[in-house]
Design a protein with these regions (language model features):
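Short glycine-rich donor-binding/catalytic loop of glycosyltransferases
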Residues: 132, 143-144, 149-150, 161, ...
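Outer-envelope exported proteins of Gram-negative bacteria
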Residues: 64-66, 137, 141-143
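Beta-rich strand-turn-strand
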Residues: 110, 125-138, 146-148
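Domain-scale signature associated with acetyltransferase and cell-envelope carbohydrate enzymes
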Residues: 1-119, 126, 161, 170-213
Length: 213
C-alpha cells in the first residue's frame, strides 16, 4: 500500500497527472486482444498500436502480466501478411469490387497468435511481427523488429532482432520460471519487492529456493 492506496489493475492511469501512461487491460475493447493485470504502455491508446487484426484471420494478441511497453511499439498481426506463393501478392479478396473469394487458410501466411508472456520489457519503437512468442522476463531493445521467438529472460536487439545474451544463468532462469511471481497476490508481491528489485543474484536464488520449499 502506497499513500493509502492498494495497487488496482483496473485503474487506467496509474501515475497521477500522466495521461500518457496507462494500464492496458481496462482499456481493451477488441475481444481478440487479451492483456494481463498491470501491463502498461507509454501511450493513451493501446489498440492504436495493434495493426491488421482482422476478424476473419481468427488470430489473437495475448500479453501477460506486468509487461512494460514503451512509446511507439507496434504489434503487427497476421492480416498484414500477403500471399507469397502466387504470381501476385495483391490482396484482391480483401478489397471491395474484386471478384475473388478468400483463398484457403492453408494458402495464406498465417502464423498463429502473437504471445507476449509476463514481465517483458519492450523498448521504444520496436515492432513485433505476427505469430511471435516472447518468453517471460525477456527484454526487447529499442527499435528492434522481432520476427522470431524470444526465449525467456533473453535480451534481443536489432532488425531483425537477434539474441545478445541471457539475463541470468540457467539456474536462476529455471527458478524464476517455477516461481512465477507475477501470479501471486498483490500483498505477496508487495512483500517480494525487495527480492524482485535486488541485484545480488545469489541472495535472490537463495530466497526463491526458500520460497519454493
Amino acid at each position: 500500500m502506497k499513500d493509502g492506496k492498494h495497487p488496482n489493475p483496473n485503474t487506467i492511469h496509474p501515475i497521477a497527472g500522466y495521461d500518457k501512461e496507462i494500464y492496458v487491460k481496462p482499456t481493451i475493447t477488441n475481444p481478440n486482444i487479451i492483456v494481463g493485470d498491470f501491463t502498461y504502455i507509454a501511450d493513451s491508446d493501446f489498440e492504436s498500436h495493434v495493426s491488421h487484426l482482422y476478424e476473419w484471420n481468427d488470430d489473437k494478441l495475448i500479453i501477460g502480466k506486468f509487461c512494460q511497453i514503451a512509446a511507439g511499439v507496434e504489434f503487427v498481426m497476421n492480416g498484414a501478411n500477403h500471399q507469397m506463393n502466387a504470381v501476385s501478392t495483391f490482396p484482391f479478396y480483401t478489397l471491395e469490387g474484386w471478384e475473388m473469394s478468400p483463398p484457403a487458410k492453408t494458402d495464406l501466411p498465417l502464423k498463429g497468435d502473437t504471445v507476449i508472456k509476463n514481465d517483458v520489457w519492450i523498448g521504444q519503437n520496436s515492432v513485433i511481427l505476427p505469430g511471435v512468442h516472447i518468453g517471460d522476463g525477456a527484454i526487447i531493445g529499442a527499435n528492434s523488429v522481432v520476427g522470431s521467438d524470444v526465449p525467456p529472460y533473453t535480451k534481443v536487439v536489432g532488425n531483425p532482432a537477434r539474441a545478445i545474451q541471457k539475463r541470468f544463468d540457467d539456474e536462476l532462469i529455471e527458478l524464476l520460471l517455477r516461481f512465477k511471481w507475477w501470479d501471486r497476490s498483490i500483498d505477496e508481491i508487495n512483500r517480494l519487492i525487495p527480492i524482485l528489485t535486488c541485484s545480488d543474484l545469489d541472495k535472490v536464488k537463495a530466497e526463491i529456493k526458500k520460497q519454493l520449499g
